[in-house]
Regions:
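The feature captures the beta-strand-to-loop junction immediately N-terminal to the Walker
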Residues: 27-29
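Helix-to-loop junction immediately C-terminal to a conserved catalytic motif
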Residues: 42
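Conserved ABC ATPase "signature" region
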Residues: 97-112
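Conserved ABC ATPase signature
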Residues: 116-120, 124
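Catalytic Walker B motif of ABC-type/P-loop ATPase nucleotide-binding domains
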Residues: 141-144
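H-loop/switch region of ABC-family ATPase nucleotide-binding domains
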Residues: 176-177
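A short, surface-exposed alpha-helical micro-motif characterized by mixed small hydrophobic
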Residues: 182-184
Length: 225
């Protein structure tokens, strides 16, 4: 699968298979193509060549209906917390306000229903994004550096939710620069560099015995050129 933006190849003939009910960390230096990797799965970026298959489905709309994505920078409406929840609910299978409230409670936003989303802290905004993603009960959850620069409470809550959703059968793919987080959460790792998949293996193997020099340098905190 290849993705080209302008004249630049962002993903270069990548070929990988993500196991159902796994938690896959997509790792790599800045500019490796991690975010575009997730956006391609989410249908936000056009594929130049190749194809994407999810549970035997190849139709982009069908695939997108099976998933939800949480971005590093929350994308919220300038409305109340509950209005943000209702907006997503109305786009898909409409859910009761009680169910939406239960999801807010789940992410630690109980009592915030009428608070304007713009007045939330960074961590609260990301937790609201998480609650909105769970509205559609997705089979696949995509997270693009979901805990970057968050307070410890929000970070721990989101990590716990990732593990909880995975425990009930959800497949999770996330990007991160936090090696400790990748070790805590991931069952599998995809390592990207310059738009190519250099390694795909189970997490423990990747961190104990990386096969490529690029992966070794990345794990050791060295700059890749």
């Amino acid at each position: 699968l290849s993705v080209v933006l302008g004249q630049k190849i962002i993903l270069d003939k990548i070929n990988c298979k993500i196991k159902s009910n796994s938690i896959t960390a997509v790792l790599g230096p800045n500019g490796a193509g991690k975010s575009i990797f997730l956006q391609t799965i989410n249908g936000l970026v056009s594929i130049q060549s190749g194809r994407l298959t999810f549970n035997s489905m190849q139709n982009n709309q069908e695939i997108r209906e099976q998933q939800a994505m949480v971005f590093q920078t929350p994308v919220l409406l300038r409305r109340t917390v509950m209005a943000n929840m209702q907006f997503v609910s109305n786009l898909r299978n409409k859910k009761s306000n009680q169910l939406l409230k239960n999801l807010l409670d789940k992410v630690g936003l109980e009592g915030y229903e009428e608070k304007p989303a713009r007045l939330l802290s960074g961590g609260e905004k990301q937790r609201l994004s998480m609650a909105r993603a769970l509205i559609v009960n997705p089979n696949l959850l995509l997270f693009d550096e979901p805990t970057a620069n968050l307070d410890p409470y929000s970070l721990n809550l989101i990590e716990d939710l990732v593990l909880e959703e995975n425990s009930i059968g959800k497949t999770v793919i996330f990007t991160t620069h936090d090696m400790s987080q990748a070790k805590r959460l991931a069952t599998d790792v995809i390592f990207l560099n310059k738009g190519k998949v250099l390694e795909q293996t189970v997490s423990k193997t990747f961190f104990k015995n990386p096969k490529t020099l690029e992966a070794q340098k990345y794990i050791n905190g060295e700059i890749l050129i």
